Amino acid sequence: MDEVQYDMYTTLATLYDTQDLTMPSSNAQRIGAIAETRFITECLERDFEPHTPTTPMPWDYIVHCPAGDLKVQIKSTSVRDRSAYTVNSSCGASVKGHMSDDIDVVGIYISPLQEWWMIPRYLIKSKTIKLYPENPSKSKYKQYQNNWSVYYE
């Protein structure tokens, strides 16, 4: 590559804003980024098509799958409190808000267990979701543990 062409590419590269290429700044943001990346991988391995919205929406992905086009909100947690993993069901930075009724599925990734819970949105009534991976009698969402059937129904 000649020097003129190299300078042109270097100039073009500096015009792009690389702000979005920075690493997540907190551990929670890293866990969220890992969960979203794993979700995309899981979808592609199942021949689903995950699409991110181009404008801010209450869902993270629209997933084209055998059940149709589903709006999916991804949540993640790594903190265990006694026998439960707890996730806030609100969207955004505020825990006062509520989860949008436009969402079809809430995908929750428990990072230490590397496990997914795919819960239909209409079943979530409270601002916190408690998941009990080892205690089926306490968990009202146990049937959605590592269960992707909502994408096939």
Model-derived regions: residue spans:
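Acidic-basic catalytic patches of nuclease active cores, encompassing PD-(D/E)XK
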Residues: M8-H51
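Short beta-strand segments
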Residues: L70, E115-W117, K127
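Catalytic cores of nucleic-acid endonucleases
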Residues: K75-W117, R121
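Residue-level recognition of single "structural anchor" positions
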Residues: S26-A28, G32, R46, G97-H98, ...
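Conserved functional hotspots at enzyme active or ligand-binding sites that engage polyanionic ligands
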Residues: I40-L44, L70, V87-M99, V150-E153
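Conserved catalytic cores of phosphodiester-cleaving nucleases, focusing on short active-site segments
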Residues: C43, Y61-V63, G68-S78
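Short, glycine-/polar-rich solvent-exposed loops and beta-turns at beta-strand/coil boundaries
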Residues: T54-P56
